[in-house]
């Protein structure tokens, strides 16, 4: 059952109802429900859905070709287009006379495998934007890539989008829709522990206590949540070890830059750069006292609920949890 995202669906449906070319950019952290949102939106509509893979250009071209051919003929074909440009132009041509959605999920994987993909898209958008009824959706989980290579001023696709949505975790009210049997107090506890990320909420069972849920997930080495924060960092940053150290320092109570620098054992200039990236990822938040300009009084706190809980309790007890003694 699909829950929430009413505002996002309304925006996408308004774009779909227009009689002209539309280009929406969706981005947000992994597990936040971007793919589920796209699936819900395109259900019952004429759409080509293609998810990029972390492979080479040839593999992505073959997969893209299959998605197009399956839409066009209803069958999986054993042939591929000559190039990604030819495949894209074919889709733009299909949308000359009718509304058609092309949803490209995990766009960064494709763009990294084909250095000319963004420029090719730019060229085709400029060529067809006045005649095509295509609704193009680019979706990505690498927030830094989407912001720097799709939304940024110097990006080839800058100025072409007609909408952009940063998909965020649910707030508390939306989170409550996932649970029917938790008491209000337990729902508040669950939200405080895992936040509003759909993938984590789906692993919480309202038929058992909050304590049992913690044991089944955070304290269970076979659970996907057990190593989730570290896995997410590895997908987003190049030096996860130092990021881990900084997050651990903040989660354990170091809130001022000098304290963080001392705990981590790095210069403040280094910590500042890494903290800036963590803020961009929505993992850390910088708070400045009311009436003060940004200064040494600024505090750093863990913004993400699940990261805060995990880094506060799991690393220090890893050996106990690993041997099943938690």
Show which residues each predicted segment covers:
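Phosphate-binding site recognition
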Residues: 1-325
